[in-house]
Regions:
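Conserved HGGG/HGGXW glycine-rich cap/lid loop of the alpha/beta-hydrolase fold
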Residues: 2-54, 274
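Catalytic active-site module of serine/aspartate enzymes centered on a nucleophile-bearing elbow/loop
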Residues: 238-281
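Conserved catalytic-core motifs of eukaryotic protein kinase domains, centered on the activation segment
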Residues: 29-31, 55-61, 121-124, 222-223
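Flexible "cap/lid" loop of the alpha/beta hydrolase fold
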Residues: 97-101, 108-141
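Helix-loop "lid/cap" segments that line or gate small-molecule binding pockets
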Residues: 146-160, 171-174, 186-191
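Structural signature of beta-strand start/N-cap positions in the alpha/beta core
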Residues: 16, 41-43, 82-85, 106-109, ...
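Conserved serine/cysteine hydrolase catalytic core
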Residues: 175-246
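Active-site loop/oxyanion-hole signature of alpha/beta-hydrolase fold enzymes
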Residues: 6, 39, 49-87, 91, ...
Length: 281
């Protein structure tokens, strides 16, 4: 696992924050949040999960959220981290949930930014897509398609030039040397996301938990192949955020109105201020 371990700038407050990136993201996409948390006195650990970015992309691997959580736990043990705050975005929100369920004594607080998995897609009627079908889809990834998807879903139809670097990051991985391994691991990870819901276990989270939700997000795995009547019910974050916040015993919700899937990238100053204020409560 590749990772960043960023010490607190100035006066350390003694707390650690582990960042869990999303499916189309890397640890590097947390850059403004890492800086804000470090300046606020936190030690920040931001790994690339196995299968992503700077980490190994094995030819044969049984992907599960439990396995990725175990990998992350082993990394934290190696770094001497006993207690931590966990912050996950998108697919990283599903992983953060699983991590908090597996290691509740270690997790002081849990925060999730537009986590996917606020609904169980297969239970709602989204058709199954095989790993080979995902693989074929991933091999076709190009900048134009990624840019259009991110503009619509991540930024609610808006675009700024600074978003382009994250398009090129993703496309570079999928078009560069080793792109077949990247696509294969991506396919295995999509299968994990679809088949391993965490939705039914939110009620078991016992630590203070914050949902940070851009309410114009429409992300839903498999919505592109779902029947119209199913697709119409998926990915409504304006409804999913409040619903799931009520399922979590110590759940809180902060809504970023009018924003999409990545408020930490779209409005980093506001997002980071909101996060640091909640952590300081």
């Amino acid at each position: 696992m590749g990772y960043m371990d960023v010490p607190a700038q100035g006066q350390a407050n003694g707390h650690n924050v582990v960042l869990m990136h999303g499916k189309n993201f890397c640890a590097a996409t947390w850059e403004t949040t890492i800086d804000a948390l470090s300046k606020a006195g936190y030690r920040v650990i931001a790994p690339d999960q196995v299968g992503f970015c700077t980490s190994s992309k094995p030819a044969h691997y049984q992907y599960s959220f439990q396995q990725l959580a175990d990998n992350t736990h082993a990394l934290l043990e190696q770094l001497g981290v006993k207690q931590t705050i966990v912050l996950g975005h998108s697919t990283g929100g599903m992983l953060a949930t699983r991590y908090a369920l597996m290691y509740p004594q270690q997790v002081e607080r849990l925060a999730m930014v537009n986590p996917i998995g606020l609904e169980d897609w297969k239970a709602l009627g989204v058709p199954y897509r095989t790993v080979d079908q995902w693989y074929a889809r991933e091999l076709k990834l190009d900048a134009e398609g990624v840019r259009a998807y991110e503009r619509k879903t991540y930024y609610a139809g808006r675009w700024k030039p600074e978003y382009e670097r994250w398009v090129q990051m993703l496309v570079g991985l999928n078009k560069g040397p080793g792109h077949e391994a990247v696509a294969w691991n991506s396919a295995l990870i999509y299968d994990m996301i679809y088949t391993q819901p965490v939705y039914h276990e939110f009620k078991h989270l016992q630590m203070p938990t914050l949902l940070l939700i851009g309410d114009k997000d429409t992300t839903a795995i498999g919505s592109d192949i779902a029947p119209p009547e199913v697709k119409a019910r998926l990915g409504n974050y304006a409804e999913l955020g409040p619903q799931v916040a009520k399922l979590i015993p110590k759940g809180e919700l902060i809504t970023f109105e009018g924003m999409g899937h990545a408020p930490q990238i779209e409005e980093p100053v506001r997002f980071n201020r909101t996060l640091v204020e909640w952590l300081g409560k």
